């Protein structure tokens, strides 16, 4: 992914290494410069070599790379939130055009294509005259299926698009996330996102009268919700529980 080059450049410059020092004997300075600019990729073996040249471990590098990737997405979400609450469809479409342009010039366009789909989902939520294409939903589902280690990005992506999927798929994906407790135990931000996702899955099951699956998400939410959780989420949870009781009586 091209942002890896940007992260490498941050490590190189902060360590006061020149392009020549970082490139070493296995790479030219022009090749390394293109990698830092996101204009080319490099083989894994060479990547490890240039990390050694600037004395950075792969663990430290990937940790910073994940944070860099999350920062990009958080920046986009900061633009999305005011558009969502003001029903600014034109603003969403402007962001979509920007994502499409980035995908055209990127060596790894999938990230920007997924962002476009996320924005389309938000547009559909605010204006029912727009619709989601099944091909786009399939692309997101295929991406999520292939990702073994979910980050904040995947949580936000699925958390904003779950309503377009059938209840069985939402239940399967939701369960997979819920059963990986180590993912959120030490990271409070992730824990809150997982809680919100559990509430979303719970609501989705209730709306489709899938009470057996709803019971799972109710029990899971009960387990992870605590006094540190904001009052809003707690109130939403109690509202859903009452709705569940009423719905079961009318079936």
Model region roles, listed by residue range:
Residues 45-60:
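DNA major-groove recognition helix of helix-turn-helix/homeodomain DNA-binding modules
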Residues 15-33:
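Short alpha-helical DNA-recognition segment
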């Amino acid at each position: 992914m091209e942002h890896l080059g940007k992260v490498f450049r941050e490590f190189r410059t902060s360590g006061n290494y020149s392009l020549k020092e970082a490139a070493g004997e296995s790479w030219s300075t022009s090749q390394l410069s293109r990698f830092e600019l996101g204009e080319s990729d490099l083989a894994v073996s060479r990547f490890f070599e240039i990390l050694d040249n600037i004395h950075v471990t792969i663990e430290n590098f990937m940790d910073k790379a994940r944070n860099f990737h999350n920062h990009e997405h958080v920046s986009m979400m900061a633009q999305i939130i005011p558009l969502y609450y003001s029903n600014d469809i034109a603003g969403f479409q402007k962001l979509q055009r920007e994502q499409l342009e980035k995908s055209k010039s990127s060596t790894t366009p999938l990230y920007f294509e997924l962002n476009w789909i996320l924005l389309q989902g938000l547009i559909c939520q605010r204006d029912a005259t727009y619709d989601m294409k099944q091909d786009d939903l399939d692309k997101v589902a295929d991406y999520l299926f292939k990702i073994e280690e979910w980050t904040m990005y995947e949580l936000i992506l699925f958390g904003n698009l779950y309503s377009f999927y059938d209840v069985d798929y939402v239940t399967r994906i939701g369960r997979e996330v819920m059963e990986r407790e180590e993912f959120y135990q030490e990271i409070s931000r992730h824990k809150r996102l997982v809680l919100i996702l559990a509430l979303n899955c719970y609501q989705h099951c209730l709306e489709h009268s899938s009470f057996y699956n709803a019971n799972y998400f109710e029990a899971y939410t009960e387990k992870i919700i605590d006094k540190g959780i904001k009052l809003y989420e707690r109130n939403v949870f109690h509202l859903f529980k009452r709705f569940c009781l009423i719905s079961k009586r009318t079936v």
